[in-house]
Amino acid sequence: MKKIFKAVLNTVPRPLLIRLSYVARPILAAALQGNKFTDPIDGKSFRTFLPYGYGKQRNNVLSPSTLSLERHRLLWLYLKNETDFFTAPKKVLHFAPEQAFYKVFRNLKNLEYTTTDLNSPLADVKADICNLPFANDSYDVILCNHVLEHIPDDKRAMQELYRVLKPGGFGIFQIPQDLNREVTFEDNSITDAKARAEIFGQYDHVRVYGHDYFEKLRDIGFKVSEVDYTKTIAPELVERYCLAPGEIIPICYK
């Protein structure tokens, strides 16, 4: 199964993957029913989660029902437990909307919810993150997760995120990050898909962020809280929800 998943991820275009997943999800969820692991997003339990990864596959990380990964479940728990995201009126901009969140967020009556991406079939607005068609100070919350590692000019993208965020608002900009690396590594001469996968971890990534990612955001003007949220969750729940211990959520305030 791991080989099949890896082949599909690396050969099927992402917009088509999203469409195909609507057929596959109910079948996978029914086949893997159990009570060992739980997806906190929809509360469903399974005997195992699925493997996932464009390069090296991680075992037991992809929820069959919502298609959430470790980072999605962690973010869900943070938003649910530590913010008023689900209750207070908010204008939200969501980049590259994840299927795990899309329908839930779309149906929240308290949110004025807009999605954006260049290619996703779930995007309301087709837009370049480096040249957004939104006015200054437009959004209370911006979600932009696992996007910046794809963007050659990530500084410009960060400036645009800062521009459209309202003063007093917050953004969450998760990225794949090597916290053992002090300085971000990027090399614009690496354009081959196989080389990028080997060096950056995925065929369409252009860098590996280090611990200096947080300073990059601060240099733009954000006030950044580096939240290690798994430390606040009981170890048995970290295991049951299949979270990644030590994963940092960057909460960015304007």
Identify the role of each PLM range.
Residues 95, 139-143:
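Hydrophobic beta-strand segment of the Class I
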Residues 146-150:
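Short catalytic micro-motifs in class I SAM-dependent methyltransferases
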